[in-house]
Amino acid sequence: MKNTFGQAVTLTLFGESHGAAVGAVLDGLAPGLPVDGDFLRRQLSRRRPTTALDTARQEPDNYQILSGVFQGRTTGTPLTIVIPNENTRSGDYTYGLARPSHADYAAYCKYHGYEDWRGGGHFSGRVTAPLVAAGAILLSALAGVGVTVGTHILRCGDAWDRPFADRAAADVAALQGADFPALTDEAAQAISAAILAARERQDSVGGITQTAVCGLPAGVGEPWFDSVESLLSHAVFSIGGVKGIEFGGGFSAVCGYGSDFNDSLRMENGRVVTETNRNGGVNGGITNGMDVVFQCAVKPTPSIGQPQQTVDFLRGEDAELTIHGRHDPAIIRRICPVLDSVTALVLCDLLTQRFGTDYLAKGAGL
């Protein structure tokens, strides 16, 4: 039963959806990294439900940093973030009625009935709040050494955005100040319409996200079990709702030939670059100096307002369930900062392993 990820830089998550609080512990960070409270709050606001596209559960996310920060900088000791739960409604849930495609029955089998089942408990998307708070600190550390991360919605239902350019830095920079995680206004409007249409039908909708990492040096990662792709996949699949991942051209590679998919190399200002980026910035599990790019499949939110067939696993009986709680018609908008955060965790861990604990502190002028 493990809730910790990482080797050199680790993150532990704790708490439940309707418990007193949710939180995170970051360990292995270099001392002296600046902690930007404004950026942390901005990242939390990107994850927070704010519109008709999201759940009606409104949480202020008034975080507290209990340890690991002194006078605005990391101390190098475990950094603990706690976010109180201030708006719970446990009466919306009935223990024993397994919500289709939720973790209710699986959790009951694993924890023998001792799990906190209210609102999904430890499996709830609520636990991504401290993940995003911790991720804000990690993203700031990466920015200090010239590494940026951005995620947009590539597809939601039948609505599409354009993909990142092969050199994605300008697109990633544009996302930092965007109100909606799309690269074009037309896509933002079409995606919003798709989500609202699902809500009107008491249904939900999924989609595809695309994440880009710019500025990573070549040579980061390991060749086999700790490859960049392996670790990013591990972290990404920790997010509830993610059901698939591909890097670069991914599954489109099966439709062509090597002459179509290979990335030709050339020199540019004394640096090795590729003409295209169909391999997503990774060869042999190791970064090649180009942008790391991957897409994730995000399933429709399983909580919908239509009657569904299920079981009462306490009684051993078939049952029908209509969910009346406060839920998202799509999580794909709110999942973008979560993807940025787990990506930052993997990268900080790998960079620290490759270059040492103080590498990330170089960006802070230390």
PLM region spans:
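Generic N-terminal targeting/processing segments that precede catalytic cores or assembly contacts
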Residues: M1-L366
